[in-house]
Amino acid sequence: MALHVPKAPGFAQMLKEGAKHFSGLEEAVYRNIQACKELAQTTRTAYGPNGMNKMVINHLEKLFVTNDAATILRELEVQHPAAKMIVMASHMQEQEVGDGTNFVLVFAGALLELAEELLRIGLSVSEVIEGYEIACRKAHEILPNLVCCSAKNLRDIDEVSSLLRTSIMSKQYGNEVFLAKLIAQACVSIFPDSGHFNVDNIRVCKILGSGISSSSVLHGMVFKKETEGDVTSVKDAKIAVYSCPFDGMITETKGTVLIKTAEELMNFSKGEENLMDAQVKAIADTGANVVVTGGKVADMALHYANKYNIMLVRLNSKWDLRRLCKTVGATALPRLTPPVLEEMGHCDSVYLSEVGDTQVVVFKHEKEDGAISTIVLRGSTDNLMDDIERAVDDGVNTFKVLTRDKRLVPGGGATEIELAKQITSYGETCPGLEQYAIKKFAEAFEAIPRALAENSGVKANEVISKLYAVHQEGNKNVGLDIEAEVPAVKDMLEAGILDTYLGKYWAIKLATNAAVTVLRVDQIIMAKPAGGPKPPSGKKDWDDDQND
């Protein structure tokens, strides 16, 4: 009989062999804080217009060169459970606002770093948490008073482009004026009267070659495809969309046919040809002059399409088919039947064009109220275009936020310093031990202008003391001047560097929640990982169409 080895007494004897558990301040809380600090330190250097790029190679060996925190975190696949909570908070920020993910990380990291100092002094975790929650509520009370202006007219391209400039600046510093104008044109052209703006209605088509300044906006959709038949341009297009292959419906029968004469050979496939001819003619008779199909196109069907002057476009992606249906107002038909008038889509012109050396099919809507707008991006490398696409995404999301709430607060660290100043003076009035946590919460706001200053290569302490001095005089809108070679400050409202109110509101809320959640953990219990080989960690979604 095998010798029985007794387990160590205590918590471990209840768990299966191989399980790990950590408890108490030293093992659990400080370790978690350390992991979150490391994560915040990674993305902190990418904060702001002068932030550095990160080169990330993911598990599929795809290369990303970007300073967009959301992309960096998504591709890093963070394993540490506490750091994962902060990553989740930044994902929530991306879903809620679409921008400000790095703010959440930097701020949450600063909160936890300062919480560690308080815990080492001897405060209890519950006192730190209570202080942080009081300070967060206070920050949300102060924030509406810091609003410096509101968007007046979201249908004015010049005004919208000036408001989008700040969010694009942090991703594409130097190209922000041109890109903001492009995005403003695209957003304003499809902004419905109801005021419900859908970010999916702005499409991006990336075409290699030329430079960023050759990018343009089109009302309608652009596909990197070629037409199948001879017809390459149609004006006043009536469009029939099919989700099935453009082919005859013939049952596959196995059998041997004995053909004795040439006439029999001629007649053998005539019935099939006549049927195909009748089908294509029926479609042409409805007035449809463009057919878009989601499957393969048979040679015979192509021949008859050319005969009846029908333009044929093949889209492999079901997502593209859906978006096209939405753009032109068509219904995708599952069988090759002639469409009725309601099922056909309309647009002003469909034509084959060449951008650089890439063939594209353009479905153009001249009307200003087209359902979908496409930004055609040009760039010298794929990585550059991917990064510009992320900047466009941020710009479009900022426009969406402005349609929900038009209020704006000053950027460049001005809002953060004002919040820090007011929350510190509020902390002085609190009698309990929470006042230390409230003051540290205020100090955490300094991490934002500090990161901006460090990334711009100026002395952070000097900048922050200058900002405090100016804010003490009552200039709420003064922030860091990142373009100056020396530590300098300027009025953000005059410079046009503005952040959305909602973006700041949610970022403070989510960062505080994440930090408090991490602090609340006092035990980590990890079961032994299941044995056996790990499944291949390839792409989660086998249907790759949505990325086309």
From Swiss-Prot:
Residues 529-548 are annotated as: Disordered. ATP binds at G100, T101, N102, S170, K171, G412, D499, K504. InterPro entries: Chap_CCT_theta, Chaperone_TCP-1, Chaperonin_TCP-1_CS, Cpn60/GroEL/TCP-1, GroEL-like_apical_dom_sf, GROEL-like_equatorial_sf, TCP-1-like_intermed_sf. Mg(2+) binds at D99. The modification Phosphotyrosine is found at Y30, Y505. There is a cross-link at K459 (Glycyl lysine isopeptide (Lys-Gly) (interchain with G-Cter in SUMO1)). Gene3D superfamilies: GroEL, GroEL-like equatorial domain, TCP-1-like chaperonin intermediate domain. It is found in: Cytoplasm; Cytoplasm, Cytoskeleton, Microtubule organizing center, Centrosome; Cytoplasm, Cytoskeleton, Cilium basal body. Keywords: Acetylation, ATP-binding, Cell projection, Chaperone, Cilium, Cytoplasm, Cytoskeleton, Hydrolase, Isopeptide bond, Nucleotide-binding, Phosphoprotein, Ubl conjugation. It catalyses: ATP + H2O = ADP + phosphate + H(+). One of its GO terms (cellular component) is extracellular exosome. ADP binds at Y47, G48, G100, T101, N102, F103, M169, S170, K171, G412, D499. Belongs to the TCP-1 chaperonin family. Component of the chaperonin-containing T-complex (TRiC), a hexadecamer composed of two identical back-to-back stacked rings enclosing a protein folding chamber. Each ring is made up of eight different subunits: TCP1/CCT1, CCT2, CCT3, CCT4, CCT5, CCT6A/CCT6, CCT7, CCT8. Interacts with PACRG. Interacts with DNAAF4. Interacts with synaptic plasticity regulator PANTS. Component of the chaperonin-containing T-complex (TRiC), a molecular chaperone complex that assists the folding of actin, tubulin and other proteins upon ATP hydrolysis. The TRiC complex mediates the folding of WRAP53/TCAB1, thereby regulating telomere maintenance. As part of the TRiC complex may play a role in the assembly of BBSome, a complex involved in ciliogenesis regulating transports vesicles to the cilia. It is linked to De novo genetic variants in nearly every subunit of the TRiC complex, including CCT8, have been found in individuals with a broad spectrum of brain malformations, and clinical phenotypes ranging from mild to severe epilepsy, developmental delay, intellectual disability, ataxia, and other features of cerebral malfunction. This is T-complex protein 1 subunit theta. It comes from Homo sapiens.
